[in-house]
Amino acid sequence: MPIVDSGSVPALTAAEKATIRTAWAPVYAKYQSTGVDILIKFFTSNPAAQAFFPKFQGLTSADQLKKSMDVRWHAERIINAVNDAVVAMDDTEKMSLKLRELSGKHAKSFQVDPQYFKVLAAVIVDTVLPGDAGLEKLMSMICILLRSSY
């Protein structure tokens, strides 16, 4: 299933949730380094996205990005937001509330182009569990909810 960012929020099966939790645990155990790696992959393949992060301007190499405290801080926030969604897979109302709030911030305060949510989600899937339909569904849930304020 490809990652989508519109339509109805897909439901996860118990087996998909179990697979996601199992795959996510070692990723989250190294959340700082994994988060930075994901963000660097995202910026490397989508350099225009870096314009939405004023504090990242002038960081032109992967090494500069990796050493930046601002990049590390934001990467940690992304990984923690995904972790919140993983933890809340059994409480979609809680997940929805948190992600809709995050959507409002990204739409109104940061004016992020919402197309990048899906692109970043694909990088996360490729890093955590490439091609897994359940994780793609979870990322679709996140992307749909993050677009809710646009």
Curated annotation (Swiss-Prot):
User: How does the record describe its quaternary structure?
Assistant: Monomer.
Miscellaneous: This is one of the minor globin component of Sea lamprey.
Q: Where is the Globin domain?
A: 11-150
Record-linked PANTHER family: CYTOGLOBIN (PTHR46783), CYTOGLOBIN-1-RELATED (PTHR46783:SF1)
Q: Which organism is it from?
A: Petromyzon marinus (Sea lamprey)
Tell me which residues bind heme b: 74, 106
Q: Which UniProt keywords apply?
A: Heme, Iron, Metal-binding, Oxygen transport, Transport
Protein's recorded name? Globin-1
